[in-house]
Amino acid sequence: MKRIKLLEVRSELGAGTRGAGMGIDALRVACLNKGSDYFRRFNSVVVPDLNHVLFDKTPLFPFAKHIDAIYTVQKGIASAVEQTLRFGEFPLVLAGDHSSANATIAGIKAAYPQKTLGVIWIDAHADIHSPYTTPSGNVHGMPLAAALGLDNLAQQRNHPDAETEFFWRRLQNLAEPGPKLHPEHLVYVVVRDTEEEEEAIIAELGIKWIKLPEIKQKGSRQLTREIYEHLRFCDLVYISFDVDSLDSVFSLGTGTPVEDGLYLSEAENLCQDLLENDRVVCFEMVEINPTLDNGNTMAKNAFNILEKATEAIERRLRHGDVVSR
């Protein structure tokens, strides 16, 4: 890969709280206030959003709110990720809500259809609900179920209508048909706010789950080695970082802050160490919501992590690490 390209996704259709669509601009403000040239150094692409549909008085699809518009947005994200990779560039995705991750995964698989993908999910939430199990109807809680091709009908609580099911199948088959990811190639890091339906499917599938005490005990270097040993049969790796993985002391400016998360230094070190691996082909940061914040603190903290993560990616690219199709 030759260089980093920023993909800016301002869609917040999958979130339950408004404001994540402004997260990228909050990052830009944090960058300016720090005196950084970060957003001048990299080419960027803005993926179209459909946030205007949020003004509709009666949202359709109660078990997957705005899923029709989300499908349209995700087609654009997947295409942008695929094209970036095919041009030999590293897609660094800055997104509003976490539903975008399904499209990011689909775009990677479209660019590398013969490669096995591993996913490192750094988040407070498991995001493995489906329209059949969701307690909220918010699609940002569903990206991994879509990527894994799961419905989790054994834990069904809802009965979506035919149109919801139609668009859900479209998300599951985005870019190319079938699951993009196998459960054994998914690693949860610091996930700590889950529902019973999610816990049941995680246990059934045996998904690797690294919790906070293990992180504090082992440190980022050892954890990184163990994560990549677990993903040893994966040709490519995608790292998704939700800012609510941070402890709520540092992450008030996000829709769903959760206590007992990562400290800032832990997040910086973990992202840097994970991104040094030459199989990583994409990094994503999501869920910054300045409308819930005080003094843009969340974006300032996230921007510091983003800078450290980007430095690790650039070090790799200077050494010419390339994944061939």
Regions picked out by a protein language model, each given a short descriptive name:
Residues K2-R325:
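Conserved alpha-helical scaffold segments that buttress catalytic/binding sites
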